[in-house]
Amino acid sequence: MKGLLEHEPLQKYTTLKVGGPARYLCAVSDISQVQQARDFARQQNVPVVVLGHGSNVFFSEAGFDGLVILNEMKQRAYDTSSNGVTRATFGSGEDFDEIVAETVSRGLWGLENLSHIPGTVGATPVQNVGAYGVEVSDLIDSVSAVDLETGKEKVFTTRECQFAYRDSYFKTDEGRNWF
């Protein structure tokens, strides 16, 4: 697998700068690379953890005996319909605070109360981040994901995401394997 690192210190990838080595580490920037990483982990029979910017994440100094997938899925797309409604699509590896700032600079309102929340776009629906009376679930139409167990791709509706206060389907035992 291209770009695979072995025994990579995880402290380089967390905001708290702690963590021993990952047995394997790779970065992914598209769905085909996610599938390749998934296949590699299955061949090696090792667990997988997905890492965004490493905020609010602790790794043991003993490290992680598995594959760490760095989420570098970048996409920023805006589509304005004839009735003036803009639909935005963002890659899960995008910096969430940068996205908030960009939408505000474009005059697209809704996310501004969520400014300065650390992490990536992909982490926001998992935790259903919120502040000052706004939750990200108020603004999400759908979430596209890949099941790291089966390789199945799915687009989740907001109902399927089962959003609740700082919670979602993606935090459940059944939903944890979705990237």
What are these regions (language model features)?
Residues 1-139, 143, 147-149:
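Anion-binding (especially nucleotide phosphate/pyrophosphate-binding) glycine-rich loop
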Residues 154-179:
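Long, positively charged amphipathic alpha-helical accessory segments at protein N-termini or as interdomain linkers
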